[in-house]
Amino acid sequence: VTPLPQSGNPKPRMFRLPKTSGIINRMGFNNDGVQACVERVKRSSFYQNGGVIGLNIGKNALTPMADANSDYLICLRAVYEVASYVTINISSPNTKNLRQLQNSQGLEKLLLELTQERALLSEQYGKKVPLFLKIAPDLEPGQIFEIANLLERFEIDALIATNTTISRENVQSEIDHHQSGGLSGKPIKDLSNH
């Protein structure tokens, strides 16, 4: 979910790769905005009956990268009351330049701001909502090490490994292998588990 509604990328934006059991998607965080999301969650019987609600937060496509942290903070504040956990998605290949947040300097600042805000929200709501970080499978070992150190330093509760890849290794035989977007499914099993 993003602060403001956005329609995502133009259709078609999902392509099945039947020979290799993969999917390429370029959805682009299509959603109705964080306020509509929270209202929908509050109305759901699943939430009302104590179901576990995980919410994935990201930045709007039109938000400049210099203001990306503000989008994450807006979303965290809005979803905190209803979330069982919050995923900080910095790894979608379908939002221009979003993966830049995976570099250690950008990520350090983002995690500092989010964990400081979580501390304030924890006092306000009387609960500490776990924060998860979702990373790309395309990272180099050194980047993974830097991210792991930041996760430990800022006491991030979990790591979601991984989002989709921009690699097209192992799917060259597919008609739609050239489509832009993130590849998921069986073709990235080894990459996401390295």
Listing of model-derived features with the role each one plays in the protein:
Residues 1, 25, 53-57, 86-89, ...:
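Hydrophobic faces of well-ordered beta-strands that scaffold small-molecule active sites
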Residues 2-49:
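A gly/proline- and charged-residue-enriched helix-loop-helix capping module
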Residues 2-3, 59-61, 92-94, 137-139, ...:
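Active-site-proximal loop/turn and secondary-structure-junction residues that shape catalytic pockets
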Residues 34-45, 72-80, 104-115, 144-149, ...:
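Generic structural signal for well-ordered alpha-helices
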Residues 49-56, 120-139:
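Short beta-strand/loop segments at the ligand-binding rim of alpha/beta enzyme cores
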Residues 60-72, 99-100, 106, 132-152:
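Active-site glycine- and acidic-residue-rich loops that bind
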Residues 70-122, 134:
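Loop-centered beta-sheet repeat module
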Residues 93-106, 150-194:
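Glycine/Thr-rich beta-alpha phosphate-binding loop at enzyme active sites
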